[in-house]
Amino acid sequence: MESNQEYQVLLYYQYVTIDDPEAFAEEHLRYCKEIGLKGRILVANEGINGTVSGTIEQTTAYMDHMHNDERFHDMTFKIDPHEGHTFKKMHVRPRPELVTLRLEDDVNPLETTGEYLEPKDFYQALQDENTVVLDARNDYEYDLGHFRGAIRPDIKTFRDLPDWVQENKDMLEGKKVVTYCTGGIRCEKFSGWLVKEGFEDVAQLHGGIVTYGQDPEVQGDLWDGQLYVFDERISVPVNRKEHVIVGKDYFDGEPCERYVNCANPECNKQILASEENEHKYLRGCTHECRVTPRNLYVKEHELTGTQVEERLLAIGESLTQEV
């Protein structure tokens, strides 16, 4: 009967001291399983960061439970309706940091962070020629969708961002620097780091891209593409005024918003690919990934050696060619 119920996804975080993250995580996991939630929650000394899915009844109970705890009484939940769960399991894990920057001198967002810009003010900043808008997410997130004119840092993980800034300081110096991320948690710490590094005019999109897309006034305007999310949805829309596809198919460069993982489990690279190209290239991002005996696409579709060779010949490759 669950399939007839309405579900929703909660995205949230709170920087607040949690004295014993391990004990908190253990108890919190028990509670989440008890009420039927699924999702991923990280707990650290510095706070909590989570995405969970459940029925409206389950998620409402969870929000009430959290708001009844003095530490989280004012925590903001970003709510997205969905047809079902967006996770297969429930995980609550203790971590040294909520977002991994691994700074020698850590930043406490409760003490140092950039100015908060509400969606309307951020919308204005996007059109200001003296403002640099910096995407604080990873390159594959940017490639699926981003704010028009935003800078794309060439990074694979968040912890690489400070080094990228140091190498590209000339791009940012003397400008107002405005940064954004999915729900706001990365920017809380990153914008604080920018302030500590001596950037004088630093701001962040309050509540992140999710809040911007839900704002009734801006309606996601000036966002192009889709928003990458870290659950089974993979992507969600943001701009409610127009839809511009910015993603490009890994294989032919055509407009594409469909992410798949390379079929070589040792590679597992995320690539944008149409269904047609996924089949054509055996979901392998390189020849080596296409011909590996561990190729998951070949196993899933139970392809014979002859069938694999036929696919390869169609793209000018062969099982016998040197890798």
Swiss-Prot record:
- Keywords in alphabetical order, please: Oxidoreductase, tRNA processing
Q: Which GO terms describe its biological process?
A: tRNA modification
Quote the SUPFAM superfamilies the UniProt record gives: Rhodanese/Cell cycle control phosphatase
Question: Which Enzyme Commission number(s) are on file for it?
Answer: 1.14.-.-
Q: GO MF terms on file? A: oxidoreductase activity, acting on paired donors, with incorporation or reduction of molecular oxygen
Record: active site: C181
Query: Mind telling me which PROSITE patterns this protein's record contains?
Result: RHODANESE_3
CDD domains, alphabetized:
RHOD_YceA
Q: Does the keyword tRNA processing apply?
A: yes
General function of this protein: Catalyzes oxygen-dependent 5-hydroxyuridine (ho5U) modification at position 34 in tRNAs.
Recorded family membership: Belongs to the TrhO family.
**Designated name of the protein:** tRNA uridine(34) hydroxylase
Native species:
Oceanobacillus iheyensis (strain DSM 14371 / CIP 107618 / JCM 11309 / KCTC 3954 / HTE831)
